[in-house]
Amino acid sequence: MSNESNAIHTIQFSGSGVFNPDVLDATHKQLDAVEADSSIEAVFLRGEGKNFSQGLDLEFLMANPDIFSEFVTSTMHLAARFLTFPVPVVSLVNGHAFGLGAMLVLASDYAVMRGDRGFFCLPEIDIGM
């Protein structure tokens, strides 16, 4: 899920890039490591295959409705952390960016998106979130 090259730390979202509590925790741990390493000058976010991120893991949320509110709040904390991160964050949007994935792109300092494929979408209102 991560790779360091010189002064750049890359966070790569696996598969469709859906966010569940484990992915959120892993992302926070990577950000903690970057903040602790003064040699890191930038963070790159990237997806895999045709997806940057499909957003929240809706299957997980449907199976765990009791933690819905807490989980959504924790995703907002992650987006806020990217907004205020001490080194530049660059989103390399290789494909679809939905929901939280799209919000992380918006919270980045810079974003580059392929022009030939991928959708950028915030579907929360359409699905009643």
Give residue spans per PLM region.
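Glycine- (often His-adjacent) and acidic-residue-rich active-site loop
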Residues: 39, 46-81
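CoA-thioester-processing core
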Residues: 78, 98-129
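Glycine-rich beta-to-alpha transition loops that act as phosphate-gripper elements at the mouths
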Residues: 92-98
